[in-house]
């Protein structure tokens, strides 16, 4: 994170993933951290990611990769601003939530509804813009704890996602969904 940006509501960040068996590579992904809910968003591959294989001068390549990812931070801010300025009509909000549920649960039973994952957890997310809808859906899907019904009709609460791989995949997918909706509604 850049000095001086940490005092804001949110800040771009570099997400560093490592394959712990040493056979693959480091991955550096552009992300966005939101202080109010402690959510980290993973920006889609459209903004770029850097892979550094576990061979050769790794330290130098990781540093170069970090600078490359930092180079897209302004584009992340532009996307966020564009999402905040796009007011979503209710059918578009529902479509985004439906796409998120389909990604998460497939065609299986969905324990919660689109209305459930569109319900904000805090007042900062009560906006009608794309950014607010995206943030609300992302937090509800990742943190879980939403009341719902199992396939047998039993009362349940959705589970939080603790797996790094699942978190990254869902985060990327949600970013791509929001970005695609943004482009289609411009």
How would you label these PLM feature ranges?
Residues 3-186:
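Intrinsically disordered, low-complexity regions enriched in serine/threonine
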